[in-house]
């Protein structure tokens, strides 16, 4: 999920 908001980066590790 690289196109998703930065709020998800924390959970997805930037994926």
Curated annotation (Swiss-Prot):
User: What are the protein's GO molecular function terms?
Assistant: fibroblast growth factor receptor binding; growth factor activity; heparin binding; integrin binding; S100 protein binding
Q: How is it modified after translation?
A: In the nucleus, phosphorylated by PKC/PRKCD.
Chief localization class?
secreted
Keywords (A to Z) from UniProt: Angiogenesis, Cytoplasm, Developmental protein, Differentiation, Growth factor, Heparin-binding, Mitogen, Nucleus, Phosphoprotein, Secreted
Top-level taxonomic group: Eukaryota
Question: Where does this one sit in the cell?
Answer: Secreted; Cytoplasm; Cytoplasm, Cell cortex; Cytoplasm, Cytosol
Q: Name one GO cellular component term.
A: nucleus
Q: Name one GO biological process term.
A: activation of protein kinase B activity
Function per UniProt: Plays an important role in the regulation of cell survival, cell division, angiogenesis, cell differentiation and cell migration. Functions as a potent mitogen in vitro. Acts as a ligand for FGFR1 and integrins. Binds to FGFR1 in the presence of heparin leading to FGFR1 dimerization and activation via sequential autophosphorylation on tyrosine residues which act as docking sites for interacting proteins, leading to the activation of several signaling cascades. Binds to integrin ITGAV:ITGB3.
What protein family is recorded? Belongs to the heparin-binding growth factors family.
Q: Subunit arrangement?
A: Monomer. Homodimer. Interacts with FGFR1, FGFR2, FGFR3 and FGFR4. Affinity between fibroblast growth factors (FGFs) and their receptors is increased by heparan sulfate glycosaminoglycans that function as coreceptors. Found in a complex with FGFBP1, FGF1 and FGF2. Interacts with FGFBP1. Part of a Cu(2+)-dependent multiprotein aggregate containing FGF1, S100A13 and SYT1. Interacts with SYT1. Interacts with S100A13. Interacts with LRRC59. Interacts with CSNKA, CSNKB and FIBP. While binding with LRRC59, CSNKA and FIBP seem mutually exclusive, CSNKB and FIBP may cooperatively interact with FGF1.
Query: Would you tell me the protein name for this molecule?
Result: Fibroblast growth factor 1
Give the source lineage, highest ranks first.
Eukaryota, Metazoa, Chordata, Craniata, Vertebrata
